[in-house]
Amino acid sequence: MSLYSNIRTFSTRSIVLNRIKPLKFEDLTKIKLREPVVPRVANFEVSPDHPLWQFFPQGNKTKVAIRESEELDLDSREWSSAELRQKSFEDLHKIWYLTLKERNILSREVRLGESLGMGDFRQFNNVDRKLIKTQKRIKQVLLERQVAVERAQATMQDDIQKYLDDFKTRYVNCEADEVEDYHEKLVRLQYAIFGINPNLSLELLQDEETIDVNFVKGLSYIANLKVERHLKLNPQTEFELPLNGPVEELPFFLNDVEVAISQVKQLRDSGKSRMLHKIEVIPFLKQAIESHMQQEENIGGYEEEQNKN
């Protein structure tokens, strides 16, 4: 028997079997039908608070679906760039919202009129073009402000970098009697520029913004500043620069320079010193600083207990 005949036989039998199945009907007396809704005006009333009323010029007070051309504000004009430059961000947002809302109203009226085959909508389009000009000028004003901010930030960064370079030179070359004064300045500098709190605590570490990209930059600056000062005063010290990223920079932030140099040498000798990937830096610093602080707290608590005894 061919494959075709098998398929035909199967199909025929399935139809036959389907026909011989008895039809089942439920008890129709148990089916309850809902009474038909009588057409009334109340059934077509729309809530006065319905959000789609925003697409009508007078909201829920609107009486007609499409305004006449004479009802449009044809004498209006678009906002000028000079006027918009004097507005705050909040005012620009309000103007943009009102402009967009009016454009939506006009668009609804034009689309509805065209679908009904109604007449000329040139006046509607003229008003819409004025609104489009206002929106374009708002975008231009916002772009001008963004560019101004970026230029100011770039200038400020240049000034900050110049100050940091100058402070580094003075710190490295300061006299012995000036070290304490420069150390206090460094504490203020790291807080003002890099946001590194001099009273860093375990509670502050729980805040996600405590250790950020700016903190990492400050850590690098402080570590290199301290090690260069130490090497200038102790040229016989055998220590190679540059430091290999946060892994070698952190000891100079947490300890005295001599202790930090010893720790970095141990890291290098053991092969544990490596350059971290960007995604590893902040979690590493947070965990390492937290571990160091907990260790200091434990040591401090132990010493207090010993003194009491």
From Swiss-Prot:
Keywords: Mitochondrion, Ribonucleoprotein, Ribosomal protein, Transit peptide. GO terms for cellular component: mitochondrial large ribosomal subunit. GO terms for molecular function: structural constituent of ribosome. InterPro entries: MRP-L47_sf, Ribosomal_uL29_mit. Disulfide bonds: none annotated. It is found in: Mitochondrion. Its main location: mitochondrion. Coiled coil: none annotated. Signal peptide: none annotated. GO terms for biological process: mitochondrial translation. It holds the Pfam family MRP-L47. Belongs to the universal ribosomal protein uL29 family. Component of the mitochondrial large ribosomal subunit (mt-LSU). Component of the mitochondrial ribosome (mitoribosome), a dedicated translation machinery responsible for the synthesis of mitochondrial genome-encoded proteins, including at least some of the essential transmembrane subunits of the mitochondrial respiratory chain. The mitoribosomes are attached to the mitochondrial inner membrane and translation products are cotranslationally integrated into the membrane. This is Large ribosomal subunit protein uL29m.
